[in-house]
Swiss-Prot record:
One Gene Ontology cellular component annotation held by this UniProt entry: nuclear pore
Comp. bias (Polar residues): 37-69
Location of Phosphoserine modifications: S106
Keyword hit for Aminoacyl-tRNA synthetase: no
Lineage of origin: Eukaryota, Metazoa, Chordata, Craniata, Vertebrata
Protein name as catalogued: Nucleoporin NUP42
C3H1-type Zn finger ranges: 1-25
Annotated transmembrane regions: none
Location(s) in or outside the cell: Nucleus, Nuclear pore complex; Nucleus membrane
Domain notes: The FG repeats are interaction sites for karyopherins (importins, exportins) and form probably an affinity gradient, guiding the transport proteins unidirectionally with their cargo through the NPC.
Region (Disordered): 24-110
Gene Ontology BP term (one): mRNA transport
GO terms of molecular function: zinc ion binding
Membrane topology label: Peripheral membrane protein
């Protein structure tokens, strides 16, 4: 056996447990012999004390007799050298085998709840003072249900409603509806900022035991139950889903086709409005309750025959909630203005039978109600919304269209003439 050079220098930290030989020491040979509690010998720097300290660390029993992971922090932890503390007490308190296993968790739970409520109050203060978008949902904990009382409305949806009311010359109703939503948002924020006992209990119940939300289709919204219904944006809901106001329901949009509708990609309306199928002209309230009931026909983004809607007839707020399957059609106001279109984003011909086949209207809602038009005539519609004639353009706009690049600040807002397009 090799002689321990560290022992000769008086600084071997393993003592009797050393694998090398300690000449002149009792129990030389280290690890092959049992460690002695009080080894003797003429050691130069008192390695016996070091031996006792490190031997206790290396013993396997030291890991099992120390305080377990889940032990109470108030409990006195044994040191490395004292193993006479009750192991049974450690096992009970550490691994939760006592008579009341949740007794030691209640203080931590109270701290967590207090911290959660303080975080919610702080978030509400920041939300109110930062000027962030107010029509949004809120959840203080990741992968937990949203707190009730907030609606998720995108700026695009509000802008669409603005255009719908603008075409109907009823902007005051739009302003009243938006103001009502703002007031309800402020009231809910104030409730969460000044929490009372009942509000705290309801809030913690929403966070911990809230209804599990299904994964939304294509990232739109959730199936959370409605608790924040605005009278300014009513929902014509005849289904049993209890849809939230302004919510993108997961069972809409690209769901399976409903009975009486051979088209795919729809079973219920996208915004919770009732959908129906009729054989003649149908009238119904818009999906969000804006304006008056309108005479409906083919739906927006429709790539099927008029007997079936491809994207759901009440896909956006200003569009109707029912679907007309008969050949008789009545025009409604387009979503993006212009012409007497059949639906918000344009529609197909009254006798088109396949997707992308001979539409009778322009792409963005400028159409003439005709029974059959060729593809070329449908591109150059009577109203020419997609293209602007030369005589309606100013000299500056015409120069910009004829140049290779637009000049910053002088880009025309009108569509270009058809003659200048290279197709």
């Amino acid at each position: 056996m090799a002689i321990c050079q560290f022992f000769l220098q008086g600084r071997c930290r393993f003592g009797d447990r050393c694998w090398n030989e300690h000449p002149g020491a009792r129990g030389a040979g280290g690890g092959r012999q049992q460690p002695q509690l009080q080894p003797s010998g003429n050691n130069r720097r008192g390695w016996n004390t070091t031996s006792q300290r490190y031997s206790n660390v290396i013993q396997s029993s030291s890991f099992s007799k120390s305080t377990p992971w889940g032990g109470s922090r108030d409990q006195e932890k044994p040191s490395f050298g004292s193993f006479d503390s009750g192991a049974s007490t450690n096992r009970k308190e550490g691994f939760g085998l006592s008579e009341n296993p949740f007794a030691s968790l209640s203080p931590d739970e109270q701290k967590d709840e207090k911290k959660l409520l303080e975080g919610i109050v702080k978030d509400m203060e920041v939300w109110e003072s930062s000027g962030q978008w107010m029509f949004s949902v809120y959840s203080p904990v990741k992968k937990k249900p949203n707190i009730s009382g907030f609606t998720d409305i995108s700026p695009e949806e509000l802008r669409l409603e603005y255009h719908n009311f603008l075409t109907s010359n009823n902007l005051q109703s739009y302003l009243n509806s938006v103001q009502r939503l703002i007031n309800q948002w402020r009231n809910r924020v104030n409730e969460l900022k000044s929490l009372n006992i009942s509000t705290k209990v309801a809030l913690l119940s929403d966070v911990k035991d809230g209804v599990n939300q299904a994964a939304p289709a294509f990232g739109f919204g959730s199936s959370q139950a409605a608790t924040f219904v605005s009278p300014g944006f009513p929902v014509n809901n005849s289904s049993s889903d209890n849809a939230q106001n302004f919510s993108f329901k997961t069972n809409s949009g690209f769901a399976a086709a409903s009975s009486g509708s051979p088209a795919g990609f729809r079973s219920s309306p996208a915004f919770g409005a009732a959908a129906s199928t009729s054989s003649a002209i149908s009238t119904s309230a818009p999906a969000f309750g804006f304006g008056k009931p309108e005479v409906t026909s083919a739906a927006s983004f429709s790539f099927k025959s008029p007997a079936a809607s491809s994207f759901g007839s009440p896909g956006f707020s200003g569009l109707p909630a029912s679907l007309a399957t008969g050949p008789v059609r009545a025009p409604v106001a387009p979503a993006f203005g212009g012409g007497s279109s059949v639906a918000g984003f344009g529609s197909l011909g009254s006798h088109s039978h396949a997707a992308f086949s001979k539409p009778s209207s322009d792409t963005f809602g400028n159409s003439s109600i005709s029974t059959s038009l060729s593809a070329s005539s449908s591109i150059i519609a009577t109203d020419n919304v997609l293209f602007t004639p030369r005589d309606k353009l100013t000299v500056e706009e015409l120069e910009q269209f004829q140049s290779k690049k637009f000049t910053l600040g002088k880009i025309p807002l009108k569509p270009p003439p058809l003659e200048l397009l290279n197709i």
